[in-house]
Swiss-Prot record:
The gene is xseA. The keyword Cytoplasm applies. This is Exodeoxyribonuclease 7 large subunit. It comes from Shewanella baltica (strain OS223). The lineage of its organism: Bacteria, Pseudomonadati, Pseudomonadota, Gammaproteobacteria, Alteromonadales. Bidirectionally degrades single-stranded DNA into large acid-insoluble oligonucleotides, which are then degraded further into small acid-soluble oligonucleotides. It is an enzyme of class 3 (hydrolase). GO terms for molecular function: exodeoxyribonuclease VII activity; nucleic acid binding. Heterooligomer composed of large and small subunits. Its main location: cytoplasm. Disulfide bonds: none annotated.
Protein backbone atom coordinates (compact mmCIF):
# COMPACT_ATOMS: atom_id res chain seq x y z
CA UNK A 1 0.00 0.00 0.00
CA UNK A 2 1.42 3.37 -1.02
CA UNK A 3 2.22 5.75 1.80
CA UNK A 4 0.72 9.21 2.01
CA UNK A 5 1.53 12.27 4.06
CA UNK A 6 -1.19 11.19 6.47
CA UNK A 7 0.31 7.69 6.81
CA UNK A 8 3.99 8.32 7.49
CA UNK A 9 5.84 5.35 8.96
CA UNK A 10 8.42 5.52 11.69
CA UNK A 11 11.39 3.19 11.36
CA UNK A 12 10.21 1.17 14.36
CA UNK A 13 6.71 0.81 12.95
CA UNK A 14 8.04 -0.28 9.55
CA UNK A 15 10.34 -2.91 11.07
CA UNK A 16 7.52 -4.14 13.30
CA UNK A 17 5.10 -4.60 10.42
CA UNK A 18 7.75 -6.30 8.27
CA UNK A 19 8.37 -8.72 11.16
CA UNK A 20 4.64 -9.48 11.43
CA UNK A 21 4.39 -10.14 7.69
CA UNK A 22 7.42 -12.44 7.57
CA UNK A 23 6.54 -14.36 10.73
CA UNK A 24 2.87 -14.65 9.84
CA UNK A 25 3.32 -15.94 6.28
CA UNK A 26 6.33 -18.27 6.49
CA UNK A 27 5.85 -19.96 9.88
CA UNK A 28 8.26 -22.82 10.69
CA UNK A 29 10.66 -23.83 7.90
CA UNK A 30 13.54 -26.27 7.34
CA UNK A 31 16.76 -24.77 6.00
CA UNK A 32 19.92 -26.47 4.75
CA UNK A 33 23.22 -24.57 4.60
CA UNK A 34 26.86 -24.17 5.61
CA UNK A 35 27.78 -22.59 8.97
CA UNK A 36 30.01 -19.50 9.05
CA UNK A 37 30.73 -16.69 11.56
CA UNK A 38 29.74 -19.00 14.45
CA UNK A 39 30.02 -17.40 17.91
CA UNK A 40 28.98 -18.51 21.39
CA UNK A 41 29.17 -15.62 23.93
CA UNK A 42 28.98 -16.04 27.69
CA UNK A 43 25.17 -15.79 27.63
CA UNK A 44 25.02 -19.31 26.13
CA UNK A 45 23.21 -18.20 22.96
CA UNK A 46 24.55 -19.17 19.51
CA UNK A 47 24.88 -16.74 16.61
CA UNK A 48 25.84 -17.87 13.12
CA UNK A 49 25.37 -17.36 9.41
CA UNK A 50 23.96 -20.04 7.09
CA UNK A 51 25.07 -19.74 3.49
CA UNK A 52 25.07 -21.52 0.17
CA UNK A 53 26.98 -20.70 -3.03
CA UNK A 54 25.24 -17.34 -3.58
CA UNK A 55 23.31 -16.22 -0.47
CA UNK A 56 23.46 -16.11 3.29
CA UNK A 57 21.19 -15.42 6.27
CA UNK A 58 21.89 -14.53 9.89
CA UNK A 59 20.66 -17.00 12.50
CA UNK A 60 20.29 -17.13 16.28
CA UNK A 61 19.75 -20.17 18.49
CA UNK A 62 19.03 -19.29 22.08
CA UNK A 63 20.32 -21.17 25.10
CA UNK A 64 17.11 -23.03 25.87
CA UNK A 65 17.09 -24.48 22.35
CA UNK A 66 20.78 -25.19 21.69
CA UNK A 67 21.10 -27.33 24.84
CA UNK A 68 19.26 -30.09 22.97
CA UNK A 69 21.83 -30.17 20.13
CA UNK A 70 24.08 -33.23 20.45
CA UNK A 71 27.12 -31.63 18.77
CA UNK A 72 29.01 -28.33 18.84
CA UNK A 73 28.66 -26.54 15.48
CA UNK A 74 31.82 -25.43 13.68
CA UNK A 75 32.42 -23.13 10.72
CA UNK A 76 32.19 -24.93 7.39
CA UNK A 77 29.80 -27.62 8.68
CA UNK A 78 26.71 -28.49 6.63
CA UNK A 79 23.59 -28.61 8.82
CA UNK A 80 19.82 -28.83 8.56
CA UNK A 81 17.96 -26.46 10.86
CA UNK A 82 14.33 -25.86 11.71
CA UNK A 83 13.16 -22.42 12.75
CA UNK A 84 11.07 -19.34 12.13
CA UNK A 85 11.88 -16.14 10.27
CA UNK A 86 11.92 -13.05 12.46
CA UNK A 87 13.08 -9.44 12.24
CA UNK A 88 15.57 -8.02 14.71
CA UNK A 89 13.88 -4.62 14.91
CA UNK A 90 16.73 -2.56 16.48
CA UNK A 91 18.78 -3.07 13.30
CA UNK A 92 16.11 -3.87 10.77
CA UNK A 93 17.79 -7.22 9.99
CA UNK A 94 15.74 -10.31 9.30
CA UNK A 95 17.06 -13.54 10.74
CA UNK A 96 16.18 -17.17 11.37
CA UNK A 97 15.47 -18.17 14.99
CA UNK A 98 16.63 -21.79 15.10
CA UNK A 99 14.68 -24.34 17.16
CA UNK A 100 16.54 -27.53 16.20
CA UNK A 101 19.75 -28.41 14.37
CA UNK A 102 21.04 -31.64 12.84
CA UNK A 103 24.08 -32.58 10.73
CA UNK A 104 23.11 -32.40 7.07
CA UNK A 105 23.10 -36.16 6.41
CA UNK A 106 21.06 -37.22 9.45
CA UNK A 107 19.08 -34.03 9.23
CA UNK A 108 17.51 -34.87 5.88
CA UNK A 109 16.44 -38.27 7.17
CA UNK A 110 15.08 -36.72 10.34
CA UNK A 111 13.12 -34.20 8.28
CA UNK A 112 11.60 -37.01 6.23
CA UNK A 113 10.86 -38.93 9.45
CA UNK A 114 9.04 -35.95 10.99
CA UNK A 115 7.06 -35.32 7.82
CA UNK A 116 5.94 -38.95 7.55
CA UNK A 117 5.13 -39.14 11.26
CA UNK A 118 2.89 -36.07 11.00
CA UNK A 119 1.20 -37.44 7.90
CA UNK A 120 0.48 -40.87 9.40
CA UNK A 121 -0.68 -39.35 12.67
CA UNK A 122 -3.14 -37.20 10.75
CA UNK A 123 -4.39 -40.35 9.00
CA UNK A 124 -5.04 -41.99 12.37
CA UNK A 125 -2.49 -44.81 12.14
CA UNK A 126 -1.17 -44.03 15.63
CA UNK A 127 -4.53 -43.72 17.35
CA UNK A 128 -4.68 -45.56 20.67
CA UNK A 129 -8.20 -46.88 20.06
CA UNK A 130 -6.95 -48.87 17.05
CA UNK A 131 -4.36 -50.80 19.07
CA UNK A 132 -5.08 -54.53 19.54
CA UNK A 133 -4.58 -56.35 22.81
CA UNK A 134 -2.18 -59.25 23.07
CA UNK A 135 -3.69 -62.73 23.45
CA UNK A 136 -3.88 -63.90 27.05
CA UNK A 137 -2.35 -67.30 26.36
CA UNK A 138 0.35 -67.03 23.72
CA UNK A 139 1.39 -70.42 22.31
CA UNK A 140 3.10 -69.43 19.07
CA UNK A 141 5.11 -66.33 18.26
CA UNK A 142 5.98 -65.32 14.71
CA UNK A 143 9.32 -63.52 14.63
CA UNK A 144 9.92 -61.29 11.60
CA UNK A 145 13.67 -60.65 11.42
CA UNK A 146 16.94 -61.79 9.88
CA UNK A 147 17.54 -65.48 10.71
CA UNK A 148 21.27 -64.81 11.16
CA UNK A 149 21.20 -61.61 13.21
CA UNK A 150 21.85 -61.02 16.90
CA UNK A 151 18.19 -60.14 17.48
CA UNK A 152 16.86 -63.67 16.83
CA UNK A 153 19.50 -65.16 19.13
CA UNK A 154 18.46 -62.79 21.94
CA UNK A 155 14.77 -63.56 21.41
CA UNK A 156 15.27 -67.35 21.41
CA UNK A 157 17.47 -67.16 24.50
CA UNK A 158 14.90 -65.16 26.49
CA UNK A 159 11.96 -67.35 25.43
CA UNK A 160 13.87 -70.54 26.30
CA UNK A 161 14.65 -69.15 29.74
CA UNK A 162 11.22 -67.77 30.57
CA UNK A 163 8.77 -70.11 28.82
CA UNK A 164 10.22 -73.04 26.85
CA UNK A 165 6.72 -74.17 25.87
CA UNK A 166 6.26 -71.26 23.46
CA UNK A 167 6.77 -72.26 19.83
CA UNK A 168 8.66 -69.85 17.58
CA UNK A 169 8.13 -69.55 13.82
CA UNK A 170 10.65 -67.37 12.01
CA UNK A 171 9.60 -65.39 8.94
CA UNK A 172 13.00 -64.55 7.47
CA UNK A 173 13.42 -61.12 5.98
CA UNK A 174 15.96 -58.41 5.26
CA UNK A 175 16.28 -55.80 8.01
CA UNK A 176 18.56 -53.30 6.27
CA UNK A 177 18.95 -51.91 2.77
CA UNK A 178 16.84 -50.48 -0.02
CA UNK A 179 14.63 -53.57 -0.47
CA UNK A 180 14.32 -54.39 3.24
CA UNK A 181 10.99 -52.56 3.74
CA UNK A 182 9.38 -54.50 0.88
CA UNK A 183 10.79 -57.76 2.26
CA UNK A 184 9.33 -57.04 5.73
CA UNK A 185 5.91 -56.23 4.24
CA UNK A 186 5.94 -59.57 2.39
CA UNK A 187 6.80 -61.46 5.60
CA UNK A 188 3.92 -59.78 7.51
CA UNK A 189 1.50 -60.57 4.68
CA UNK A 190 2.63 -64.22 4.61
CA UNK A 191 2.08 -64.53 8.35
CA UNK A 192 -1.42 -63.04 8.00
CA UNK A 193 -2.23 -65.46 5.19
CA UNK A 194 -1.12 -68.51 7.18
CA UNK A 195 -2.56 -67.41 10.55
CA UNK A 196 -0.38 -69.99 12.27
CA UNK A 197 0.82 -67.75 15.13
CA UNK A 198 -0.83 -65.75 17.90
CA UNK A 199 1.29 -62.60 17.60
CA UNK A 200 4.05 -61.12 15.44
CA UNK A 201 7.34 -59.79 16.83
CA UNK A 202 9.03 -57.41 14.38
CA UNK A 203 12.62 -57.00 15.54
CA UNK A 204 16.28 -56.28 14.80
CA UNK A 205 19.31 -54.98 16.73
CA UNK A 206 20.44 -51.39 17.05
CA UNK A 207 22.05 -49.22 14.40
CA UNK A 208 22.23 -45.74 12.97
CA UNK A 209 19.22 -43.83 11.69
CA UNK A 210 20.18 -44.86 8.17
CA UNK A 211 20.57 -48.53 9.20
CA UNK A 212 17.05 -48.58 10.68
CA UNK A 213 15.49 -46.57 7.86
CA UNK A 214 13.55 -49.49 6.39
CA UNK A 215 11.37 -49.47 9.54
CA UNK A 216 10.34 -45.88 8.66
CA UNK A 217 8.64 -46.91 5.42
CA UNK A 218 5.13 -45.62 4.74
CA UNK A 219 4.24 -48.90 3.03
CA UNK A 220 5.41 -50.85 6.08
CA UNK A 221 3.35 -48.59 8.34
CA UNK A 222 0.16 -49.39 6.41
CA UNK A 223 1.03 -53.11 6.33
CA UNK A 224 1.41 -53.19 10.14
CA UNK A 225 -1.79 -51.17 10.58
CA UNK A 226 -3.77 -53.54 8.34
CA UNK A 227 -2.36 -56.72 9.93
CA UNK A 228 -4.96 -59.07 11.40
CA UNK A 229 -2.35 -60.34 13.84
CA UNK A 230 -1.18 -58.14 16.72
CA UNK A 231 2.28 -56.71 16.04
CA UNK A 232 4.96 -55.94 18.62
CA UNK A 233 7.76 -53.67 17.36
CA UNK A 234 11.14 -54.24 19.07
CA UNK A 235 13.59 -52.42 16.83
CA UNK A 236 17.03 -51.19 17.88
CA UNK A 237 17.90 -49.96 21.34
CA UNK A 238 15.80 -48.04 23.83
CA UNK A 239 16.87 -44.66 22.38
CA UNK A 240 15.91 -45.67 18.83
CA UNK A 241 12.38 -44.82 17.67
CA UNK A 242 10.92 -45.81 14.30
CA UNK A 243 7.61 -45.38 12.49
CA UNK A 244 6.94 -49.07 13.09
CA UNK A 245 7.06 -48.37 16.86
CA UNK A 246 4.25 -45.81 16.52
CA UNK A 247 2.03 -48.00 14.31
CA UNK A 248 2.55 -51.31 16.11
CA UNK A 249 0.13 -52.39 18.79
CA UNK A 250 2.92 -52.43 21.37
CA UNK A 251 6.46 -51.12 21.30
CA UNK A 252 9.33 -52.86 23.13
CA UNK A 253 12.66 -51.02 23.53
CA UNK A 254 14.89 -54.01 22.56
CA UNK A 255 14.55 -57.51 21.04
CA UNK A 256 15.06 -59.08 24.49
CA UNK A 257 12.40 -56.82 25.97
CA UNK A 258 10.03 -57.87 23.20
CA UNK A 259 10.58 -61.54 24.01
CA UNK A 260 10.03 -60.88 27.70
CA UNK A 261 6.84 -59.00 26.90
CA UNK A 262 5.42 -61.98 24.99
CA UNK A 263 6.46 -64.64 27.52
CA UNK A 264 5.02 -65.30 30.96
CA UNK A 265 6.79 -65.90 34.25
CA UNK A 266 5.29 -67.75 37.20
CA UNK A 267 2.79 -65.11 38.23
CA UNK A 268 2.44 -63.26 34.91
CA UNK A 269 3.08 -59.90 36.63
CA UNK A 270 5.86 -58.91 34.25
CA UNK A 271 3.64 -59.29 31.19
CA UNK A 272 0.81 -57.32 32.72
CA UNK A 273 3.15 -54.56 33.82
CA UNK A 274 4.92 -54.40 30.46
CA UNK A 275 1.58 -54.36 28.62
CA UNK A 276 0.27 -51.56 30.79
CA UNK A 277 3.52 -49.65 30.42
CA UNK A 278 3.53 -50.10 26.65
CA UNK A 279 -0.07 -48.90 26.36
CA UNK A 280 0.77 -45.96 28.56
CA UNK A 281 3.72 -45.14 26.31
CA UNK A 282 1.55 -45.37 23.22
CA UNK A 283 -1.09 -43.14 24.79
CA UNK A 284 1.57 -40.70 25.91
CA UNK A 285 3.09 -40.57 22.41
CA UNK A 286 -0.33 -40.07 20.84
CA UNK A 287 -1.11 -37.35 23.37
CA UNK A 288 2.32 -35.82 22.75
CA UNK A 289 1.72 -35.68 19.00
CA UNK A 290 -1.66 -34.09 19.56
CA UNK A 291 -0.24 -31.55 21.96
CA UNK A 292 2.70 -30.80 19.63
CA UNK A 293 0.27 -29.91 16.83
CA UNK A 294 -1.78 -27.80 19.23
CA UNK A 295 1.34 -26.13 20.62
CA UNK A 296 2.60 -25.36 17.13
CA UNK A 297 -0.72 -23.69 16.30
CA UNK A 298 -0.67 -21.70 19.54
CA UNK A 299 2.94 -20.66 18.97
CA UNK A 300 2.00 -19.38 15.53
CA UNK A 301 -0.90 -17.36 16.98
CA UNK A 302 1.14 -15.95 19.85
CA UNK A 303 4.23 -15.01 17.86
CA UNK A 304 3.23 -11.36 17.67
CA UNK A 305 2.65 -11.17 21.41
CA UNK A 306 5.36 -13.57 22.57
CA UNK A 307 7.27 -11.92 25.48
CA UNK A 308 9.95 -14.58 25.11
CA UNK A 309 10.66 -13.35 21.58
CA UNK A 310 11.02 -9.82 22.90
CA UNK A 311 13.31 -11.10 25.66
CA UNK A 312 15.37 -13.00 23.12
CA UNK A 313 15.76 -9.85 21.04
CA UNK A 314 16.88 -7.96 24.13
CA UNK A 315 19.33 -10.76 24.93
CA UNK A 316 20.67 -10.66 21.38
CA UNK A 317 21.03 -6.90 21.59
CA UNK A 318 22.75 -7.30 24.96
CA UNK A 319 25.20 -9.79 23.44
CA UNK A 320 25.98 -7.36 20.63
CA UNK A 321 26.47 -4.50 23.08
CA UNK A 322 28.69 -6.75 25.20
CA UNK A 323 30.84 -7.55 22.16
CA UNK A 324 31.01 -3.85 21.27
CA UNK A 325 31.90 -3.00 24.87
CA UNK A 326 34.65 -5.61 24.92
CA UNK A 327 36.02 -4.18 21.67
CA UNK A 328 35.83 -0.62 23.02
CA UNK A 329 37.54 -1.67 26.25
CA UNK A 330 40.27 -3.37 24.26
CA UNK A 331 40.81 -0.23 22.18
CA UNK A 332 40.72 1.94 25.31
CA UNK A 333 43.27 -0.27 27.03
CA UNK A 334 45.49 -0.03 23.97
CA UNK A 335 45.26 3.78 24.00
CA UNK A 336 45.94 3.89 27.75
CA UNK A 337 48.93 1.59 27.27
CA UNK A 338 50.35 3.89 24.60
CA UNK A 339 49.72 6.90 26.83
CA UNK A 340 51.38 5.15 29.76
CA UNK A 341 54.45 4.47 27.64
CA UNK A 342 54.56 8.13 26.57
CA UNK A 343 54.19 9.37 30.16
CA UNK A 344 56.84 6.92 31.32
CA UNK A 345 59.19 8.29 28.68
CA UNK A 346 58.43 11.87 29.71
CA UNK A 347 58.79 10.96 33.38
CA UNK A 348 62.14 9.39 32.64
CA UNK A 349 63.23 12.65 31.07
CA UNK A 350 61.98 14.62 34.11
CA UNK A 351 63.39 12.25 36.72
CA UNK A 352 66.14 13.48 39.15
CA UNK A 353 68.47 10.86 37.80
CA UNK A 354 68.07 12.21 34.30
CA UNK A 355 68.41 15.80 35.52
CA UNK A 356 71.46 14.90 37.61
CA UNK A 357 73.05 13.38 34.54
CA UNK A 358 72.36 16.56 32.55
CA UNK A 359 73.55 18.82 35.39
CA UNK A 360 76.60 16.60 35.88
CA UNK A 361 77.54 17.04 32.27
CA UNK A 362 76.89 20.77 32.57
CA UNK A 363 78.99 20.94 35.77
CA UNK A 364 81.85 19.13 34.08
CA UNK A 365 81.64 21.57 31.21
CA UNK A 366 81.57 24.58 33.59
CA UNK A 367 84.45 23.14 35.64
CA UNK A 368 86.47 22.80 32.46
CA UNK A 369 85.65 26.37 31.49
CA UNK A 370 86.45 27.58 35.03
CA UNK A 371 89.78 25.79 34.90
CA UNK A 372 90.56 27.43 31.59
CA UNK A 373 89.39 30.82 32.91
CA UNK A 374 91.51 30.48 36.06
CA UNK A 375 94.48 29.50 33.98
CA UNK A 376 93.95 32.53 31.76
CA UNK A 377 93.45 34.74 34.81
CA UNK A 378 96.60 33.44 36.47
CA UNK A 379 98.54 34.00 33.29
CA UNK A 380 97.20 37.54 33.03
CA UNK A 381 97.97 38.18 36.73
CA UNK A 382 101.45 36.82 36.31
CA UNK A 383 102.04 39.14 33.40
CA UNK A 384 100.60 42.03 35.41
CA UNK A 385 102.81 41.22 38.39
CA UNK A 386 105.85 41.09 36.19
CA UNK A 387 104.93 44.45 34.70
CA UNK A 388 104.32 46.05 38.11
CA UNK A 389 107.50 44.51 39.45
CA UNK A 390 109.36 45.99 36.59
CA UNK A 391 107.81 49.37 37.26
CA UNK A 392 108.59 49.06 40.96
CA UNK A 393 112.09 48.02 40.21
CA UNK A 394 112.50 51.12 38.11
CA UNK A 395 111.66 53.45 41.00
CA UNK A 396 113.04 51.22 43.75
CA UNK A 397 115.96 52.53 45.90
CA UNK A 398 117.68 49.31 45.18
CA UNK A 399 117.58 50.18 41.52
CA UNK A 400 119.17 53.50 42.40
CA UNK A 401 121.88 51.71 44.31
CA UNK A 402 122.55 49.46 41.36
CA UNK A 403 123.33 52.54 39.32
CA UNK A 404 126.15 53.59 41.72
CA UNK A 405 124.22 55.72 44.16
CA UNK A 406 123.98 55.21 47.96
CA UNK A 407 121.40 55.95 50.67
CA UNK A 408 122.37 57.47 54.04
CA UNK A 409 120.21 57.22 57.15
CA UNK A 410 120.67 58.31 60.75
CA UNK A 411 120.55 56.11 63.78
CA UNK A 412 116.76 56.31 63.64
CA UNK A 413 116.80 54.95 60.14
CA UNK A 414 115.62 58.27 58.75
CA UNK A 415 116.97 59.21 55.32
CA UNK A 416 119.41 62.07 55.53
CA UNK A 417 118.73 64.31 52.57
CA UNK A 418 120.06 67.59 54.00
CA UNK A 419 122.98 68.75 56.16
CA UNK A 420 120.52 70.71 58.18
CA UNK A 421 119.53 67.52 59.94
CA UNK A 422 123.11 66.66 60.98
CA UNK A 423 125.46 67.66 63.75
CA UNK A 424 129.08 66.86 64.31
CA UNK A 425 129.43 63.46 65.92
CA UNK A 426 126.21 61.93 64.55
CA UNK A 427 126.45 58.33 63.49
CA UNK A 428 125.35 57.57 59.92
CA UNK A 429 124.60 54.39 57.92
CA UNK A 430 125.32 54.42 54.25
CA UNK A 431 123.67 51.75 52.08
CA UNK A 432 125.63 50.80 49.01
CA UNK A 433 124.81 48.38 46.24
CA UNK A 434 126.88 45.82 48.03
CA UNK A 435 127.02 46.28 51.79
CA UNK A 436 126.79 49.18 54.31
CA UNK A 437 129.20 51.79 55.74
CA UNK A 438 128.97 53.06 59.35
CA UNK A 439 130.47 56.55 59.75
CA UNK A 440 130.62 59.51 62.15
CA UNK A 441 130.08 63.14 61.05
CA UNK A 442 133.33 65.02 61.55
CA UNK A 443 132.63 67.94 59.27
CA UNK A 444 129.55 69.54 57.74
CA UNK A 445 129.72 71.50 54.53
CA UNK A 446 126.67 73.38 53.46
CA UNK A 447 125.72 73.56 49.80
CA UNK A 448 127.35 76.47 48.11
Amino acid sequence: MQGTKNNIYTVSRLNGEVRQILEGQLGKIWLNGEISNFSSPSSGHWYLTLKDHSSQIRCAMFKGRNQTVSFKPINGQQVLVKGAISVYEPRGDYQLLIESMLPAGDGLLAQQFDALKMKLAAEGLFAADTKRRLPKNIQRIGVITSPTGAAIRDVLHVLARRDPSIEVIIYPTQVQGETAAQSICQAINIANQRLEVDVLLLTRGGGSLEDLWCFNSEALAHTIYNSALPVVSAVGHEVDTTISDYVADIRAPTPSAGAELLSQDSDNKAQKLATALSRLQQSAKHYQLKQERRLSLLEHRLQRQDPKRTLQQFEQRFDEMQLRLESALSNRLHILSRRQQLLASRLEQQSPKHKLAIEGNRLSYLASRLQDALQDKLSQSEQRIKYVAHQLETVSPLATLSRGYSITTDIHNQVVDSTDKLTIGDSLQTRLRHGQVISTVTQIKPLE
